[in-house]
Amino acid sequence: MIVDNSKDFDLKSFLANLTTHSGVYRMLDKHGEIIYVGKAKNLKNRINSYFSKGAKDSKTLMMVEQIARIEITITPSDYEAYLLENNLIKQHRPKYNILFKDDKSYPYLVISRDKFPRVSFYRGKSAYKKGQCFGPYVSISSVKNTLNTIQKIFPIRQCENSYYKSRVRPCLQYQIKRCLAPCVGLVSQQQYDEQLAILKKFLAGKFSSVLEEISANMYQASEDMEYEKAQVYRDQLVVLRKLQQQQIVDIQEDKTFDVIGIYMQDSYASIALLQIQNGDVVADRHWSIDAKGQDKTSIMHAFLSHFYLGDEIRNIWPKNIILSKVEFADITDLMNSISQKIGQAINWIIAPAADNLKWLKLAEVNARQKLNIYTSSKSQYQKRLESLKEFLESEKDIKRIECFDISHFQGEATIASCVVYTDDGEDRKSHRRYNIKDIKSGDDYAAIHQAVSRRVSSGLEADNLPDVMIIDGGKGQIHQAEAVFREYGIQDKVQLVSLGKGVERISGKEKIYKGFDDTEYTLDEHNPGFLLLRQVRDSAHDHAIKGQRKKVSANRQSSIIEEIEGVGPKRRKALMMYFGGWQELSRASVDEIAKVKGISKKLAQEIWECFH
C-alpha cells in the first residue's frame, strides 16, 4: 500500500507514525519529482536516520535539504522490496541514486516463435519480445560471426518472414545446404525441431553435449541405413571439431561464473563484468558512474541489484560470482534475493584463491582502464560546458542543452529535430522529432517557430525547459525563436543562441548570435565552447536528416498505393496492420497480399505491380 497521498505533508507527524515493516521509500522534491529511492528492512529506523544528528556526507545533506515529501510502499519481504526498488530506480532515474549507464546496447541472437523459427539478431533488451534470446554478445561483428557459424552447422532459416512466406521454390541457401527449406515443405516439423533443439544447446554453451548428441545421431542414422542423413551429421561434426580446435582453452563446463571488478578514483567509479563460460571469457561489459559520497560496498550493492534483479536476459546464469572485496555482511540479504530470482543457489566468492584471482585482477584492470577513458572524456566535455557558460555569460551551470534543426525534401516532408545534451553528454533517449504541418513549402522560419513553440509549451507544463536552446541558423531563425520566448515570457529562463554558416558557408567560421542581441559573434575554431556548439548542432542536423528521409520514403510508398483505384484509407490501414510497414508489403507475393481482409486477388495483383 502507498502511505501519504496528501498534498500537505507534515514531516514530523510522518516520521513519528512510520511503520517498522520492510519496504521501499521515495523522496520527492517540491516539484513532486522523485529524487531518491531506497529500501529498508525497517522503514521507521531507516527514514528517521536521514533526519538524525549523525554524520552524513555532503551529498546526503544536499538531498535532505530538498525533501518536500516522502512516500513509502510496504512489501511482504526483502525480496519484493529489492525488486520494487530496482524497478522504481529504472523508471524514474532519481538524481541522488547511483545510476548505472551501460556503455552500449548489446546485440542478442533470437530464435523466433514461428512454427518454423528463424534465427536472427536484435539490439537491446527489447529482443526478448521477439523470441528466445541468447547473449548478449560483445559486438555486432561477434554476433554476425556466430550467425555465419550457425548457418554452416545448423540448416535453420535466417530469412525475414515476408521473404519466407513469399517463396514458391527453395532459395540458394537450400542449394548450398544451409537451410532445410521449410518455406516450401521440404522438411518435416520433427526434423526441423531436432535441429533447432541442438542449435539451442549450442548457443547455451553446451558444446560437449552437442558433440555427443550429433555423434550419436550419426551412428544411429548409419545403423538405420539412412546414409544421406548420416552424412549431414558427419558434416556438422567436421565443422564443430574445427571450431573446437580454434578455442584457446579446454572446455570445462563446471567453470561458468561472473567476475565483477570495481575501481574508484576521486568521485568516479567503474565496474567491469566478465562473463566466463567453460573457462573462457564470452563477454565483457562496463559501467561508469559518478560516485560522489559513495563507497565500494554501496556501489557494489547498487550494481548487483541493478544487474541481477533487473530485466537482464541470460540463458546461463553463473554458478559462481566473484566480487571485488566488499563488506560481505552488508549484502547478504541481497545475495539471497538474487538466488531466489534466478532460481538457483550461487556461490559468492569475495576473496578468490589463485585459480580465480587472475579473473578478478583482469576485471579490475578493465575497470581501471575504462575509468581512465571515462574521466578523460568527462573532463574534456566539462571544459566545453564551462567555456560555453563563459561565452553566454551564464550565472548558473548548464545542465541541459537542446538544439533544433529543420530538414525537408524540396520543400516537402518537413521535419524539425530536437537533440538533447546534459551535463553527462548526449542523451539519445531524449532526442525527438516534430512533424511540421500547415506551413508554406520550404518555410524554415515558420518551421522553427512551430517546433520551438510546441517544445516550450510542453516544457512549461512539465517543468523541464532546457538551460540553453540552440537554433541551427542565422538571424532569421533566432528571431523566430525569440518571438516564441516573448509569447511565453521565458526570456530570463532559457538562454537562446544560434549557429549559422553565414554567407561564406565555411565550416569552422560559423556566425553566432545570442538571443535578443543582434551582435554577430565569432569564436576561434578550437575554442571548447565553440566545439560544443558545433557538436550539438551537427548531432541535430544528422537527427533531422534521418527523420526526413524516413518521412519521404513513407510518403512515397503511401502515395503509390493511394493512386490505385479501390485502395482507400481503410484498406491502406488493413495493409499496414497485416504487414507492419511499406517495406514488408513491397516484398510480399500476390497471394500473400490477397490474404488481407478486403483485398481481392485482382487488387492484390495491382498492388504488387506498383512495387515491381
Curated annotation (Swiss-Prot):
InterPro entries registered for this protein in UniProt: GIY-YIG_endonuc, GIY-YIG_endonuc_sf, GIY-YIG_UvrC_Cho, RuvA_2-like, UVR_dom, UVR_dom_sf, UvrABC_protein_C, UvrC
Subcellular location per the Swiss-Prot or TrEMBL entry: Cytoplasm
Described function: The UvrABC repair system catalyzes the recognition and processing of DNA lesions. UvrC both incises the 5' and 3' sides of the lesion. The N-terminal half is responsible for the 3' incision and the C-terminal half is responsible for the 5' incision.
Name under which the protein is recorded: UvrABC system protein C
Keywords: Cytoplasm, DNA damage, DNA excision, DNA repair, Excision nuclease, SOS response
Location, primary (coarse class): cytoplasm
Gene Ontology terms, MF aspect: DNA binding; excinuclease ABC activity
Limits of the GIY-YIG domain: 20-98
CDD domains named among the record's database cross-references: GIY-YIG_UvrC_Cho (cd10434)
Ranges of residues in domain UVR: 208-243
Assembly and oligomerization: Interacts with UvrB in an incision complex.
One Pfam family linked to the record: GIY-YIG
